């Protein structure tokens, strides 16, 4: 989606549709930062006073700027707390987002700027209390501010403390981005990319630094280069309060906030119960502080206004002031200004505007314009008011006009209209009571000027932060890529394992089906063989029976014939008796044959049953052998499959191990490359900073050398004036002495006395002239020597400072490199332990599976043999009951398949 084109309904809901240029009027610039400017404005429909932060998302890094805007809007929409800035809405206009928020008087940093001295401890406690309540709310919802400092803690008219500027905030905790303002950054933020993540405890560190800022007018290390400050924070001990005037409770609170180890740092909710926060303080402490600050701002602006008015009137009457008049006027006004400010208890402070682009340090600050309607001499300024305020878009383009003053300073004397140039300078201090503020116009102008002047340093820090974020994105992208590669690798291995398992299952199913088919086939063959065997026995027995019967018939005939012959030979026996004896003999023979036949049939039946039983036992034994062969084949197949599976798992483990080592090497190589690039950039930035400082010092020295003749001329004129005064004194003394001598000496000696006095005067003037020349030469030489010595001392001090900063950078980089190498070593050891443990688990699993398989083999074979043995015993017992003897001799020998 093109930036700013609201095609996505979710994004479109973040912005209002009205035209902000028509909705908001009377815009005045009240702050400036890297993102753009902050304006005071009025809602044309409701007359509500608001603050507007304009953020452009065109130019370089458009996508990044647009994403920052979306993130800040989403973040602000979530906030509903008395100690966070109230969000009014966001509008889009010509590649610029108008972020509208409630208007506040100014920031805690402005208090230091106006009063030019540290705040009182009760005032710091009150401001810290409000900030902690806001932080507790953010941290409860897993939000991190990441840019807590005095410039981002705002104050309202009723004395309410508000957290503002959520451009650096994170909607996720923990986070690991390099964001914030250098001097307030927690160590874990600086080392976030190198050592891991951080949470809301970073805001607690920044709050501790802010307490030092409010107590000492500037954060620790503020006199140091911002980059060097980062290196210092990352590797040195936590800062502490320097002055001994603070209470032990305050000291403990600051030390508690600034624990180096985040886990030892307290949470915001815990700090709210600290003695420093809970102790009693006046309920109006912040309201009184704000009122004193507003009075001081009004007085400062009125002093500036009177200075401009005096210059304006002086120019109107006498023309432009000469140089000496201007210097004298500046000196006078400066002393007046100092007297007025000191009467309010104020001293100067270091500006809190951050040099960091990412910090978005310009808070929603504010200022006040007051208008003296009773000053007739300002009528011509009021006539130009329409020109100045006719267009809000012109206000911040024309010299950053900030105007204010107070009634009661008017001069009723009519004056002629001043020149246009002086009038434009006076426009800065016109009197119109437009809005209340605790920030003076000169402070706003100075901050805007500093923002323009520090662009190079700000761009350097912005580039450094951008590089750190880019490095982090590269690492995250690589980690995601490697994770996807590992997931794909594991999925591939898992599929291979599943395929092997499926194939093994299919093979076992095929084997089982094959074995079932073989058993069925063997059963059919056995049934057929048994039937054939039975038929063979029956056929043989039938044949034997037929032969036996035929033999009996022959024997019967032979016996019958033999008996007949015997009877025929015996003539003594009656015929009837013979017939009876023959019949009886025939019956006996038939009976004997019948018994023999029955015996034969019995023997045949017994033989048939015994042989059938024996054949069945042989079939059973053969079936047992087939079952043993089948189970042996199945178990061998399972063992082969399991061995193949184990070989595959070992191969998978080795390939995974190789991939893990390769990925770790790739990740560590990229990390080291990025660290080297980061260190190279840091070194280049430091060298560039060194050159810039040397150039600035050189320019300063050149300006001093150029200014020296003018200074020497002024000193020479001063010595000359002293010489002239001395000459005048001597001339007066000469005249007085001459008159006295002429009065006390005769007239004829007057000529000689005059000559003597003239010679004495000439001699003394010559000595005086020589002293004058000598004084000039000594002054010239001493000033030149003093300038050379001062410049040389400055050069030496700068070289020493830059050398210390370079040593600090080298120490920081060495520490980071050592920490990274140690981290890599830990990662390698952790990987080795994980790989070793995984291999041990795999080998243990293989052993357990092989043992389980062997146990299954033994149990199944044992179960089979026991079943077969029981079946054989049952068969033999039944055979015994059937009257058959031991059939084992006819059985096949058993084999031990175990």
From Swiss-Prot:
Cell compartment(s), UniProt: Cytoplasm; Cell membrane; Membrane raft; Lipid droplet
Keyword set, alphabetical order: Acetylation, ATP-binding, Cell membrane, Coiled coil, Cytoplasm, DNA damage, DNA repair, Kinase, Lipid droplet, Membrane, Nucleotide-binding, Phosphoprotein, Serine/threonine-protein kinase, Transferase
Residue stretches of biased makeup (Low complexity): 349-366
One example GO MF annotation: ATP binding
Membrane topology of the entry: Peripheral membrane protein
Cellular component, GO annotation: cytoplasm; lipid droplet; plasma membrane raft
Feature: compositional bias, Basic and acidic residues: 405-416
Broadest EC class assigned to this enzyme: transferase
Segments forming a coiled coil: 452-502, 548-649, 753-871
Location of the active site: 147
Modified residues (N6-acetyllysine): 830
Summary of the tissues where the protein is detected: Ubiquitously expressed, with a higher expression in the retina.
Modification(s) after translation: Autophosphorylated. Phosphorylation at Ser-324 by ATM following DNA damage is required for activation of the p38/MAPK14 stress-activated MAPK cascade. Phosphorylated at Ser-324 and on Tyr residues during T cell activation. Phosphorylated by LRRK2.
Residues of the Protein kinase domain: 24-277
Keyword Nucleotide-binding: yes
Modified residues (Phosphoserine): 324, 331, 343, 346, 349, 359, 442
Reactions it catalyzes: L-seryl-[protein] + ATP = O-phospho-L-seryl-[protein] + ADP + H(+); L-threonyl-[protein] + ATP = O-phospho-L-threonyl-[protein] + ADP + H(+)
Phosphothreonine, modified sites: 357
Region (Disordered): 316-372, 405-424, 565-596
Function per UniProt: Serine/threonine-protein kinase that acts as a regulator of the p38/MAPK14 stress-activated MAPK cascade and of the MAPK8/JNK cascade. In response to DNA damage, involved in the G2/M transition DNA damage checkpoint by activating the p38/MAPK14 stress-activated MAPK cascade, probably by mediating phosphorylation of upstream MAP2K3 and MAP2K6 kinases. Inhibits basal activity of the MAPK8/JNK cascade and diminishes its activation in response to epidermal growth factor (EGF).
PANTHER family, A to Z: SERINE/THREONINE-PROTEIN KINASE TAO1-LIKE PROTEIN (PTHR47167), SERINE_THREONINE-PROTEIN KINASE TAO3 (PTHR47167:SF10)
Subunit structure: Self-associates. Interacts with ERN1 and TRAF2. Interaction with TRAF2 is facilitated under ER stress conditions, such as treatment with tunicamycin, and may promote TRAF2 phosphorylation. Interacts (via N-terminus) with STK25; the interaction promotes STK25 abundance at the level of protein expression and/or stability.
Name of the protein in question: Serine/threonine-protein kinase TAO3
Organism: Rattus norvegicus
């Amino acid at each position: 989606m093109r930036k700013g084109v609201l095609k996505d309904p979710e994004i479109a809901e973040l912005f209002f549709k009205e035209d902000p240029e028509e909705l908001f009027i009377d815009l005045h610039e009240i702050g400036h930062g890297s993102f753009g400017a902050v304006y005071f404005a009025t809602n044309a429909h409701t007359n509500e006073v608001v603050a507007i932060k304009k953020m452009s998302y065109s130019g370089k890094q458009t996508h990044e700027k647009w994403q920052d805007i979306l993130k800040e809007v989403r973040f602000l929409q979530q906030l509903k707390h008395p100690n966070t800035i109230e969000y009014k809405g966001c509008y889009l206009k010509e590649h610029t987002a108008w972020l509208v928020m409630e208007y506040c008087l100014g920031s805690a940093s402005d208090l230091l700027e106006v009063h030019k001295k540290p705040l009182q401890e009760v005032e710091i406690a009150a401001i810290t209390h409000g900030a902690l309540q806001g932080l507790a709310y953010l941290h409860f919802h897993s939000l991190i501010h990441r840019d807590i400092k005095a410039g981002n803690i705002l104050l309202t008219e009723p004395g309410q403390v508000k957290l503002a500027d959520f451009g650096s905030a994170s909607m996720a905790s923990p986070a690991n981005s390099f964001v914030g303002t250098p001097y307030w950054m927690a160590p874990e933020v600086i080392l976030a990319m190198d050592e891991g993540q951080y949470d809301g405890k970073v805001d607690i560190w920044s709050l501790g630094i802010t307490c030092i800022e409010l107590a000492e007018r500037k954060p620790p290390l503020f006199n140091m280069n911002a980059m060097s400050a980062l290196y210092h924070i990352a590797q040195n001990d936590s800062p502490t309060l320097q002055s001994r005037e603070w209470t032990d409770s305050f000291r403990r609170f600051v030390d508690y906030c600034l624990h180096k180890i985040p886990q030892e740092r307290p949470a915001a909710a815990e700090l709210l119960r600290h003695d420093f926060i809970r102790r009693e303080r006046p309920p109006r402490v912040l309201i009184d502080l704000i009122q004193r600050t507003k009075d001081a701002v009004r007085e400062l602006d009125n002093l500036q206004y009177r200075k401009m008015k005096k210059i304006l009137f002086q120019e109107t009457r006498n023309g432009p002031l000469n140089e000496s008049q201007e210097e004298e006027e500046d000196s006078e006004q400066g002393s007046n200004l100092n007297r007025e400010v000191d009467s309010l208890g104020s001293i100067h402070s270091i500006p809190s505007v951050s040099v960091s682009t990412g910090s978005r340090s310009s808070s929603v600050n504010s200022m006040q314009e007051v208008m003296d309607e009773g000053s007739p001499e300002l009528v011509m300024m009021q006539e130009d008011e329409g020109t100045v305020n006719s267009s809000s878009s012109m206000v911040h383009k024309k010299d950053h006009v900030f105007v204010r003053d107070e009634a009661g300073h008017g001069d009723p004397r009519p004056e002629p209209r001043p020149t246009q140039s002086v009038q434009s300078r006076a426009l800065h201090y016109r009197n119109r009571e437009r809005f209340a503020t605790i920030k003076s116009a000169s402070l706003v102008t100075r901050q805007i000027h500093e923002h323009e002047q520090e662009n190079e340093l700000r761009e350097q820090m912005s580039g450094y932060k951008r590089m750190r974020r880019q490095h982090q994105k590269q690492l995250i992208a690589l980690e995601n890529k490697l994770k996807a590669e590992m997931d794909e690798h594991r999925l591939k291995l898992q599929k291979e394992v599943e395929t092997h398992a499926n194939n093994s299952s299919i093979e076992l199913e095929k084997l089982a089906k094959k074995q079932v088919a073989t058993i069925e086939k063997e059963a059919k063959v056995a049934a057929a063989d048994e039937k054939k065997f039975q038929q063979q026995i029956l056929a043989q027995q039938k044949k034997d029976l037929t032969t036996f019967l035929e033999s009996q018939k022959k024997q019967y005939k032979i016996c019958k014939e033999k008996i007949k012959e015997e009877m025929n030979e015996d003539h003594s026996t009656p015929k009837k008796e013979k017939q009876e004896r023959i019949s009886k003999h025939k019956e006996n023979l038939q009976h004997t044959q019948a018994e023999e036949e029955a015996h034969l049939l019995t023997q045949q039946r017994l033989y048939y049953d015994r042989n059938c039983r024996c054949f069945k036992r042989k079939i059973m034994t053969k079936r047992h052998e087939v079952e043993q062969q089948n189970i042996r084949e199945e178990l061998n197949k399972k063992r082969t499959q399991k061995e193949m599976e184990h070989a595959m798992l070992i191969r998978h483990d080795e390939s995974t191990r190789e991939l893990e080592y390769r990925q770790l090497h790739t990740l560590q190589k990229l990390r080291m490359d990025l660290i080297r690039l980061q260190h190279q950039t840091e070194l280049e930035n430091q060298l560039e900073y060194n050159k810039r400082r040397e150039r600035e010092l050189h320019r300063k020295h050149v300006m001093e050398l150029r200014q020296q003749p003018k200074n020497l001329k002024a000193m020479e004129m001063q010595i000359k004036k002293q010489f002239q005064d001395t000459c005048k004194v001597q001339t007066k003394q000469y005249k007085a002495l001459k008159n006295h001598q002429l009065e006390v000496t005769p007239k004829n000696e007057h000529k000689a006395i005059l000559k003597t006095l003239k010679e004495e005067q000439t001699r003394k003037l010559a000595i005086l002239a020589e002293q004058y020349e000598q004084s000039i030469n000594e002054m010239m030489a001493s000033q030149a020597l003093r300038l050379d010595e001062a410049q040389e001392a400055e050069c030496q001090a700068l070289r020493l400072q830059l050398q210390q900063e370079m040593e600090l950078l080298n120490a920081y980089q060495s520490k980071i490199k050592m920490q990274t190498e140690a981290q890599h070593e830990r990662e390698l050891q952790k990987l080795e332990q994980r790989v070793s443990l995984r291999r041990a688990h795999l080998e243990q699993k293989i052993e357990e599976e092989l043992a389980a398989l062997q146990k299954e083999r033994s149990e199944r074979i044992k179960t089979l043999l026991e079943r077969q043995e029981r079946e054989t015993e049952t068969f033999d017992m039944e055979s015994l009951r059937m009257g058959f003897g031991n059939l084992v001799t006819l059985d096949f020998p058993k084999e031990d398949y175990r």
